[in-house]
Regions:
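N-terminal capping segment at the start of a domain
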Residues: 2-34, 117
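Catalytic-core environment of secreted peptidases
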Residues: 51, 59, 63-87
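Active-site-adjacent substrate-binding region
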Residues: 3-6, 18-19, 151-197, 236-243, ...
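A non-catalytic alpha/beta surface segment that caps or lines the substrate-entry region
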Residues: 22-67
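Zn-dependent metallopeptidase/amidohydrolase metal-coordination segment
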Residues: 15-22, 75-76, 338-389, 397
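Midchain, well-structured core segments that form catalytic/ion-binding scaffolds
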Residues: 79, 118-282
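A short beta-alpha structural unit
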Residues: 29-33, 253-262, 274-276, 280, ...
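Flexible, glycine/charged-enriched surface loops at secondary-structure junctions
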Residues: 56-58, 110, 166-167, 218, ...
Length: 402
């Protein structure tokens, strides 16, 4: 059994949130590659060295603390949404680091830690782990741009002096990611632990509708080619057409809307928006894509608009490894807390890592189900329970694999 230091873990976790502190509660502003995110990554690096692990970083900015022999890999990410919470990703990195450190101190099995870069999608979808796993070619990733038009290939050069070289996934025997649930199910129940059974698949593309910019006061409604009206009609029709295709856990979101010229006295002539959908079944994701594209075409024809769909990004649904599920379930039983098997509706780095090794995830409750906001929080007792489950599961898994 790996004996973790809960006080040391909590102190480090709180110290990490000082990097990019929003000034609103415990929230953070730490998107990938901004100065506060880089400072946080350097600080994590100092903690990795302090723990007696070998510090490494690949060209994409993924940061590793490697134990002799590699062993079991734990971790997540420390970048945040533009308005993010203090635990999303950071919890998995600091919990993983504490378990790795405690394992070394106690002569336990080899445990390593990873802090992936750009999980939150400044440039794509779980970009750092996607490149590390080979799911996303590095040269393709380098062409991705953020909202300001900066390319990943350009921006990541800020970490060039920290890069030590490629990190071989083959040295690790498995991966566990501890994370907040980011939803209401654990918080509204007696269960304190969620053992993840699978991670949903995701599809994401950028859509542009082009109409005709004109005077808002003198253009009759019947002559308008108003792209905002087109977007509104698309949303309404899409919800109706999805009704007999989706299941209760299916979700879809229109976001990241950019209206041009975005002025009160001009009929808008162009709108670009993101279209994202998630489900646990690949076939349903494909059916939803067909409906989305057909609905866009129908709206464009009805309203005299042009439609353009950008490249499709996304990941397939992924089942978690049975051996890791069993280890986490046994650890939850040992802690004598209520727990449940549950899917993950959010995307995580574990999806990419599963391409190379067995992957598992464990959730702790999110207060009021809130995440991706400054109000994101989890009771400290639940954080410590999750840490102990993670440590116990690591011991159990390594006992049967080493």
């Amino acid at each position: 059994m790996i004996e973790v230091n809960a006080d040391r873990f909590l102190q480090s976790l709180h110290e990490l949130r000082s990097f990019g502190a929003s000034g609103h509660g415990k929230g953070v502003v730490r998107p990938a590659f901004i100065p506060d995110e880089l400072a946080a990554r350097d600080w994590v690096g100092s903690k990795i060295t302090e723990a007696g692990l070998t510090l490494a970083m690949d060209a994409m900015g993924n940061q590793f603390g490697i134990a002799p022999g590699g062993g079991l890999l734990l971790g997540s990410h420390t970048d945040s949404q533009p308005e993010g919470g203090w635990l999303d990703g950071a919890l998995g990195v600091m919990a993983g680091l504490e378990v790795a450190r405690a394992a070394r101190e106690g002569g336990g099995p080899p445990v390593s830690v990873v802090n992936f870069q750009d999980e939150e999608g400044r440039f794509g979808v779980t970009t750092g782990s996607a490149v590390w796993s080979g799911h996303l070619p590095a040269d393709t990733a380098d062409t991705l741009t953020d909202k300001s038009g900066h390319s990943l290939g350009e921006v990541r050069q800020v970490l060039a002096d920290r890069v030590t070289g490629p990190v071989d996934p083959a040295q690790f025997c498995g991966y566990i990611e501890m994370h907040i649930e980011q939803g209401p199910y654990l918080d509204t129940s007696e269960d304190r632990i969620g053992v993840v059974s699978n991670i949903v698949g995701i599809r994401d593309m950028r859509v542009t509708l082009t109409g005709e910019q004109n005077h808002a006061g003198t253009t009759p409604m019947q002559y308008r080619k108003d792209v905002f009206q087109g977007l509104s009609a698309f949303n309404t029709q899409l919800n109706e057409r999805f009704r007999n295709v989706v299941q209760p856990s299916t979700v879809w979101t229109i976001g990241h809307v950019s209206l041009s010229p975005n002025a009160s006295s001009i009929v808008p002539g162009r709108v670009t928006f993101s279209m994202q959908w998630r489900d646990s079944e690949t076939d349903r994701l494909a059916r939803m894509e067909t409906i989305i594209r057909q609905t866009l075409d129908d709206i464009a024809e009805e309203r005299g608009l042009q439609v353009e769909c950008g490249p499709m990004l996304g990941l397939e649904p992924v089942a978690m490894d049975k051996g890791l599920i069993d280890a986490l379930a046994g650890a939850a039983d040992q802690q004598a807390v209520g727990w449940r098997h549950m899917p993950s509706g959010a995307l995580h780095d574990a999806t990419n890592v599963s391409l190379h090794m067995p992957a598992g995830m464990v959730f702790v409750p999110s207060i009021d189900g809130k995440s991706h906001c400054f109000e994101e929080d989890t009771d400290e007792a639940d954080l410590v329970t999750g840490l102990k489950v993670l440590a116990d599961a690591a011991s159990r898994y390594m006992a049967v694999t080493s």
